[in-house]
Each structure stands twice: as C-alpha cells, then as structure tokens.
C-alpha cells in the first residue's frame, strides 16, 4: 500500500505527519508513502497576524486541496488549525494518540516562572486572541505583542529580548523534541483551543479502499475527544478572532468537557462544564456549546 500524503513543509508539520504515518504502519506494516509538500499563505506571510491573511483555516484549505484535486490520498493537520466547516467531500478519518493539549509559558532566560511571577508591564508574545483574552482576565497588567514564525523563530525572538515571555503549545514542543523549561498553564486559566494536541488525518469520504485502514489505526480516545470538540466548535461558532477555548477528556467511562469564552479585552468570561457518554461525543460537545451560548448571551459576550 502506498499513500500520497499532503502536508505543509515546516519541521513541525513533517513531525506531525510522521507520527500519523507511524500509527498507520502499526496496522499496515507494508505501508509506503510519498510526501506532497504544500506551501500555504500562512507559511509565506509569517510577518503578519493570522487574522490579516485568512485566520482559522489558513493552513488547512490549501493542503486539503491536494486531496480534493487527486494529488494526494490523505492530508495531515494539527486539528486546532482546522475550522469547523471543512472542504465538502472530506472526512476526519484518523487520529493518533493525543499529545498534551495545554499551552505553556516560556520565560526569557529559561527560568520556569508562572504567570504570577511576571512583573507588571512584562511583554508576552502570542498571536492568539484566545490566549490574550484569557490571560488578560487574570493579569490585566501584562502587555501582549504579536508573535509569528515557527517554534525555533519564536524561541529566538524571546532570547533576543523582543519579549519577556511567550506562549506556545506544549504539543509542538514535544513533537519537535524541544527540551526547555516552561510552565504548563492550567486549563482553568487558559483552556486549550478545540483540537489542540490532536493530529487529524483527512481523506475523501469516497475512499472505501483506505478508510477501514485509517479507522483501525485511529486512537479511539483521541477520536472521541476530537469529535466532541469539533461538534462544540461547529455549534458554538466563532473564529480566530474569538477568545474561545474547549477541551474534552475521556476518563474511564465518562467524557468530560470544559469550555470558556472571554470578551476580547479579558474583562468578562463565562465557562461551562458538562459530562456525558463517550459513545456520544457529538452530543456532549453540542450540550456544552448550547450552554456556553446561553451564558454568553446573558453576559453580553459575542461569539
């Protein structure tokens, strides 16, 4: 069996793709593959915020186009970069085991400091509206500055003194094997983006030749969490401008779901917690989204 695999060409994207392929090879040892590298607008315009060049879905659409046009059999994504409405004809077919979904704080000098240890006026680098608003909710005295580029570039900018601290996804550091000191930000303070830590493999819904193999290779815990979070995202709405976090966790026979929404300036925040049947992840996600929309309307926070 040979698969043509669409992916971006960054170190992190390639690392994620190899994780997915290794999971497939465990159930299909004869697997051969060819990488179809796609250069997206997000890769070209790294000096601009996501919101200025397309926002959520910036990386997803052009990679998926390779599958839709028949140039690739599957596309591999970091699921948090995939909007709730994907290209028609594609399905989420496989997820390897989930990496840590959390965000982390990296402080210049390699010291493991918490958000509470940063001095007033400290400059924190991130381009995420979710991270800015949620952290402003607990530390309104911090200054947030746009940060783009790959992980190496972001860490270099930190050490050059452009920032006092930066916020990164823990999963990215793990996948790249980056060994640095950091503080894992508790999800009660900063709930992850929906899909964070999950690698998603997409293919055409008509590919009956490879769908059974991908399903067999998929981690069922990660898939249940992914389906709950994506159902939540689809109903809750919001895009890259929306300070929205959500995280499902399957523990034992229960699927737990935590979500929060903040106003852009961080002055207001609402959150919900629900739990339900792990065999009905979509229902759990929709229940959380319905409750969050109700609370947001009551508090006057826009989605």
UniProtKB/Swiss-Prot annotation:
Pfam families: Porphobil_deam, Porphobil_deamC. Keywords: Porphyrin biosynthesis, Transferase. Signal peptide: none annotated. It catalyses: 4 porphobilinogen + H2O = hydroxymethylbilane + 4 NH4(+). The modification S-(dipyrrolylmethanemethyl)cysteine is found at residue 240. Its cofactor is dipyrromethane. GO terms for molecular function: hydroxymethylbilane synthase activity. It is an enzyme of class 2 (transferase). GO terms for biological process: protoporphyrinogen IX biosynthetic process. GO terms for cellular component: cytoplasm. It comes from the Archaea. SUPFAM superfamilies: Periplasmic binding protein-like II (SSF53850), Porphobilinogen deaminase (hydroxymethylbilane synthase), C-terminal domain (SSF54782). Binds 1 dipyrromethane group covalently. Pathway: Porphyrin-containing compound metabolism; protoporphyrin-IX biosynthesis; coproporphyrinogen-III from 5-aminolevulinate: step 2/4. Its EC number is 2.5.1.61. InterPro entries: HemC, Porphobilin_deaminase_cofac_BS, Porphobilin_deaminase_N, Porphobilinogen_deaminase_C, Porphobilinogen_deaminase_C_sf. Belongs to the HMBS family. Tetrapolymerization of the monopyrrole PBG into the hydroxymethylbilane pre-uroporphyrinogen in several discrete steps. The porphobilinogen subunits are added to the dipyrromethane group. PANTHER family: PORPHOBILINOGEN DEAMINASE (PTHR11557:SF0). This is Probable porphobilinogen deaminase. The gene is hemC.
């Amino acid at each position: 069996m040979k698969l043509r695999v669409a992916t971006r060409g960054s170190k992190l994207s390639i690392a994620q793709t190899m994780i997915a392929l290794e999971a497939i090879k465990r159930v299909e040892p004869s697997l051969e593959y060819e990488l179809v590298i796609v250069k997206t607008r997000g890769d070209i315009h790294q000096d601009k915020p996501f919101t200025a060049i397309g926002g959520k879905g910036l990386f997803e659409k052009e990679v998926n186009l390779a599958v839709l046009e028949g140039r690739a059999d599957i596309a591999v994504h970091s699921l948090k970069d995939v909007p709730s409405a994907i290209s028609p004809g594609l399905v989420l077919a496989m997820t390897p085991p989930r990496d840590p979904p959390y965000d982390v704080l990296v402080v210049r000098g390699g010291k493991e400091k918490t958000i509470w240890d940063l001095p007033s006026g400290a400059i924190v680098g991130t381009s995420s509206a979710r991270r800015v608003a949620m952290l402003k909710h607990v530390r309104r005295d911090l200054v947030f500055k746009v940060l783009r580029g790959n992980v190496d570039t972001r860490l270099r900018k930190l050490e050059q003194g452009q920032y006092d601290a930066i916020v990164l996804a823990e999963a990215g550091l793990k996948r790249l094997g980056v060994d640095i000191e950091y503080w894992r930000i508790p999800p009660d303070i900063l709930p992850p983006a929906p899909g964070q830590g999950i690698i998603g493999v997409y293919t055409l819904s008509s590919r009956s030749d490879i769908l059974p193999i991908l399903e067999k290779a998929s981690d069922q815990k990660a898939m249940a969490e992914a389906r709950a979070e994506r159902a939540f995202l689809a109903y809750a709405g919001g895009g890259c401008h929306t300070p929205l976090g959500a995280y499902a966790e399957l523990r034992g026979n229960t699927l737990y779901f935590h979500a929060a929404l903040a106003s852009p300036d961080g002055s207001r925040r609402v959150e919900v917690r629900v739990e339900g049947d792990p065999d009905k992840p979509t229902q759990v996600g929709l229940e959380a989204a319905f409750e969050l929309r109700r609370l947001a309307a009551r508090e006057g926070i826009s989605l």
